[in-house]
């Protein structure tokens, strides 16, 4: 340290090794402000050029010198003025620089300037921790909402006709996962967004003890589901006689279309492809000032479903049988459909003009399949005709009118129209076109209609001959144009006041139809389900459809079922149709309509029948041994009786020692005298002097401190009886298993 006086610093700074060039200035740049001890440059935080300080002030400045930005000092750094002459230098004793003296000063050292070490020693920005905190908050997962408490309703819950599993969960308070588990137990595989119908929802909610009611929308209240109910609801004074609707059925090439052609005196048969009717045609004729409507259902087996629909809208069935060919499989199938529909039948024995015709043989064959004509003491009229020669056609028409008079067919022509779709198609030029049979009321042009899942407005109507119509009365078949979609055959047409309401109902029905199809595919009609309904008293009769490889097998199965019916009276099994050959789509349709089970004895379904059965959930059982069929029928019928619980004793042991564990449980050291001990699946009885003092389960089974699953006779082991600590030496143990055995007839 030198005691020499400090030399003038007017031209050179000492702190940074850089010349300030501010000689003659009134105030040294970098000097501390009075009372603050802080450099002006430190407070501004900007880059200041000394040359900008000159000018009129008379303070020369060094051109282009940049002052380094100096942040505020931290608490460990002394004030800048202490190092720049704001106070006496503690090391040299140099007095502070005078405010008015000329000469420069040493700039701040250690912080600022272009000193790289000073830049490294600067404190971090105060905003960096805040930014890190914000980033942490953004990365933090959002809080999960609190679980909503499950509130189960006290009274019945109103449910719509169709809903999703999620909507059912929200309406009832039952978790969607619990509903899906219950549906899985019931044999229905679903997801949370799958639509289910009300019947399925009510069945599932019954398992949870929740009562439900169906909430039918107001616009659905007046919707027609059954035409017969509409006819019953009509005022008797408004009812008027209507023409009969006649369906022609029979085996392929037995002359059905030619018979209808002879009746209408047209050449319809020549226009058919291959001589086989390809669609359901509806025609109306006039006889003795009275009208008769005919439905020509195809006789080929590939169109069995269309024939079934024809039987549902008909009043009278004319069964055509060729006099030279006899009763065929399609003939028997048509008879089964007629019986299932419950409509009167007229037998028309055709081709009597042929030399090989034998009407008596035909009548005998019909009697063998359950159709007894009037000549044989039955109630089925029989008419001999020849479609080719037009023999006795008038006699057949008179018989149809006679049967119609006996049936007293009536309808109300003044009511809004209600009918059934016979067929529908998409025409390239006209759009959706449907053939409808009016069954009650009168259909007019510009009527708003609802047809199944389709709505629309009647834009045009045509008769069977192609004539434009303005209205159609009961029993009249018409072709209508104006629907917004193609309906399904068998859908009910109903006149609506508002087209908007009709569209809403059509959309609702589309949802319901999808739900029903999915539910039917998941649930189906199985043998176990039918017997479950029998057990609950819902079904008193079991319907069966039998198909076999030979007639002898059919007779043997029929005799077997007759014996089962005689052995018990609780449930009667009825064979609604039987035949020889493969299981057809017609068999599936009949089973679907009559809730029947199909039994194939050495008979398999064709591909179309298999797909149809899978789509609608129809149960088809296959057998090749008649005793297996007998056993299954007996087991299914026995399922109506309460099952019995049978005990099977599997082992005995005696207690030879006891040990008490720190958990206060008692370990019994036993010797297995007979049978075996199993850790799971067995119950144990503790007997003391022959009296049962406890009945429970085994919670632990060990040998030499090792857990074992089973101990056989002749070995010792240790065990703990669950929930029982009073076991004593000398007690006898009996190990048994419970088995549920179905009751037998």
UniProtKB/Swiss-Prot annotation:
Limits of the tr-type G domain: 241-410
Instruction: Show the segment(s) annotated as G3.
Output: 296-299
Asked if the keyword Phosphoprotein belongs to this entry, the reply reads: no
Q: PROSITE patterns annotated for this entry?
A: G_TR_2, IF2
Please give the function described in this protein's UniProt entry.
One of the essential components for the initiation of protein synthesis. Protects formylmethionyl-tRNA from spontaneous hydrolysis and promotes its binding to the 30S ribosomal subunits. Also involved in the hydrolysis of GTP during the formation of the 70S ribosomal complex.
Ranges of Low complexity composition bias in the record: 68-98, 114-126
Which terms under GO biological process does the entry name?
translational initiation
Please give the residue ranges the record annotates as the region G2: 275-279
Q: Where is the composition biased (Basic and acidic residues)?
A: 127-138
Q: What is this protein called?
A: Translation initiation factor IF-2
List positions binding GTP. 250-257, 296-300, 350-353
Record PANTHER family: TR-TYPE G DOMAIN-CONTAINING PROTEIN, TRANSLATION INITIATION FACTOR IF-2-RELATED
Cite the residue spans of the region called Disordered.
1-154
* Region entry G1, spans: 250-257
